[in-house]
């Protein structure tokens, strides 16, 4: 009996990550959903109180797809790695893209590391991008098939190690 490859998928509660899960399940992978809790500010609670929390959406989606779900509270790491850098850059007169901080340091830095420590073979998201395994053993990041939806630019700072487990 073949052992299934295990993939942890970062789930936002949106369509893209749900489709990624569904495609991986169709291909025969064992899948676990993972969501990172990044922000909870009481000042905004009154504004968004009628909206479901992103972690609730992600867990509901995981349950509907019949996969295990993990919620990681990474608020402090997110604040240090993303929010503070964003504010520093913004106050220095630049307009940063927070995804460029978040993806290598948080999504792949924390979530992927957690997934691999739990025995996962791979870590996936719903980003529109592709990777290619080269004969040299390196991995190359490629644009998404639909160039109008391409998100490879926000993954451009991922390391070879991070890409190789994606």
Predicted regions and their residues:
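Internal nucleotide-binding/catalytic subdomain
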Residues: 157-166
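ATP-dependent adenylation/nucleotidyltransferase module used to activate substrates
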Residues: 1-157
């Amino acid at each position: 009996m073949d052992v299934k490859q295990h993939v942890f998928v970062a789930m936002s509660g949106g369509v893209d990550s749900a489709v990624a899960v569904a495609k991986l399940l169709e291909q025969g992978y064992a899948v676990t959903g993972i969501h990172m809790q990044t922000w909870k500010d009481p000042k905004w609670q009154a504004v968004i109180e009628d909206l479901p929390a992103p972690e609730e959406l992600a867990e509901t989606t995981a349950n509907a797809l019949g996969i295990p779900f993990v919620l990681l509270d990474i608020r402090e790491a997110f604040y240090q790695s993303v929010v503070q850098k964003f504010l520093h850059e913004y106050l220095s007169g630049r307009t940063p893209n927070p995804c460029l901080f978040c993806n290598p340091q948080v999504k792949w830095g924390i979530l992927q590391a957690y997934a691999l420590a739990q025995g996962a073979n791979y870590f996936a998201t719903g980003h529109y991008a592709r990777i290619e395994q080269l004969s040299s053993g390196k991995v190359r990041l490629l644009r998404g098939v639909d160039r109008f939806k391409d998100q490879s630019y926000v993954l451009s700072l991922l390391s070879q190690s991070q890409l190789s487990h994606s």
